[in-house]
Each structure stands twice: as structure tokens, then as C-alpha cells.
């Protein structure tokens, strides 16, 4: 009955996404700064567009100063958009999109940005029940918005729409940004690549080339993958110690693919390799010829 109750009639609900970023940029501090406010809002709006499947079904009501966290209060008016957002959040795609847009718009190297997220609806921390999507939807539905959209958010949204239509230039305080990368692609060395699902060839190249750094890559992947958190990597190392480095690396990436399913995509692996300073291996997997 719970699953049906969230589907019928007008549906609204509210959730707050809490963000913490370091060390290269503090999103809360940047939002408090007049010159950085618009850029932070644009990062958040693009992330929501990616994760909720478009521009409809939700709106940002207010950004909260929850020092050291930045709270993004979102009102959902469509259960399908809310479900897509929850699925994206649970798979790590929200954090991935947030990281991509932050680095692109604020010109920050990927390896210098660390992000932490938490999703709440009322008193419920949804990170603890993401495996039960209907329960998350119920908590969000029960958490009704207590305010109208903040005037400042409305002004920023209007500014973003005007910029998209070409009515105003990019704010002079920021370097002119590159054309937006499609949500099904990722950027590496200023080139756009299709963000496809990982394949057997990727698994073999990774296992052949990563060597002793497989644990480092595993920890980078583990930032957004529950199956690789805690003692999981050390357990893999112990379990496959006799089989050698190739098998340890192979089992690591296999476990990532099994756990993440359709969210186990090439862009996440390339980003983990960048974070681990293994750019040459990323180039190998992407078939990029090394520079002389």
C-alpha cells in the first residue's frame, strides 16, 4: 500500500542535500561571496538537471548555511523526478555530476576536490535507507515545504535562464567556460568521451596496467561505492594475495561493476585513476596515444 500511496494524486515533498567540499574550494564560503554565488547555484542546478532527468518536477527553495555544510533545500512536485533523483543519489551519480560541474565551472583540478554528501527529509537521514526507495519517497512526501522559494534563489534562477538564452554575458569574475559536456559524456584532458558502461576490455587493461596501485584506485572508487568502503579492499588483498596483483586488481574492478550495475561507468574509473595520479593508465584505457 505504501508504494501506491506515493503515486496517486498531487505529489509534493521536500528534501535537503547537504554538501561539504574541500580542500580546493569551500562551496559554502563561495556561495556567501557575491562573486561566487551564481557559480555555485549553476553547479547545483546542473547537477539536479542531470540527476532528476530534466528541468521539470522540482525546484530549489533555499540554500542554507549549515556551517561547515551547504544545505540545498529541494521541493519535488513530481514523484517520477524524485525517484530518478534518489536512484542517481544512491548510485553515486549525483556526487559524480556535482564533482564534474564544480571542477568545470570553477576550474579546479579533479584530484584537488573532495566532496561529502548527506540527504535528509525532515528528521530522517535517507543515506541509511537508500536500499528501500519507497520508504525514501514516503519520508520526502511527509516532509512538506515550510516556505516559498527564497527571493535570492528566484533571482539566481532568472539570471541562469537569461544566460542560457544569451541575454547576459558570463560574469566577468570567472574565466569563460567551455561548452557544457552532455550528461552522457565526461571530460578528460579537454576531450569529450562517451560515459559508457565498463566493458571486459576495460577490466583487462586496468588489471594489466595498475600494478601495486590497485588499492589506491580502489579507495578512490570507494568514495562513491559502498561495496568498496571499510575493510573491503584489505579483504580483497588478503583473499587473492596468492593469485598476485593482476587478480587482485581484476577482482576489485569486478566487484565495483557488480555492485554499481549500470552506474559502473567509464568516467568514474577515469576519475579514480586521475585521483590516484595514474593518468597514463587512463590514457591507455581510452586509447589515447601518449604525448612525446
UniProtKB/Swiss-Prot annotation:
GO molecular function, one term: transmembrane receptor protein tyrosine kinase adaptor activity
Motif residue range(s): Nuclear localization signal: 215-228
GO cellular component, one term: nucleus
Annotated Death domain residues: 199-289
Record keywords, A-Z: Apoptosis, Cytoplasm, Cytoskeleton, Nucleus
UniProt GO BP: extrinsic apoptotic signaling pathway; positive regulation of canonical NF-kappaB signal transduction
Motif window: Nuclear export signal: 148-164
Primary role: Adapter molecule for tnfrsf1a that specifically associates with the cytoplasmic domain of activated tnfrsf1a mediating its interaction with fadd.
Name of the molecule in the record: Tumor necrosis factor receptor type 1-associated DEATH domain protein
Gene source species: Oncorhynchus mykiss (Rainbow trout)
